[in-house]
Amino acid sequence: LSYCSVSGCTVLREYRDYRENQGNNRIFEFAAAGWNRDGLALRAVDWLLRRSGEQQRLLLILTDANPNDDTRLPGTGNQLFSRDYSGKPAVTDAAEATALRRHGNPPLCLFSGREGDLSSARTIYGRDVVRLPSVGWFAQTVGKIIQGRLQALES
């Protein structure tokens, strides 16, 4: 699944339904595009996972932990005026990852961003953050994580 925001709409793309036997190569169609409204995407992922009916899930999220969108956050409560969807307000919105945990879908953050955004990753995803220093570490790191999570599910 990937997401991006374009012209005020967040587009979710499902590359493969895990009930199908084909489509493994669709992930290679991924292209980075648009803005990233992480809070909305995380709420959508939570909804999709809860309705899937699967009992055991592994949710890995590759992110730079820098949510940003050109559509502003509306004013609410004591905040009368709209705000940019960036910085602290966007990170607070993206902290919807806690709802995923509450619903039995704990996300594991694969952080590929700048060192300065690591604190945002921890605010959004809690202690389940793994730092990927470079793309070269991706396969080895993710392989070990998946192996560890699968072993934990078996016990």
Residue ranges of predicted features:
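Acidic, glycine-rich A-domain
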Residues: 1-155
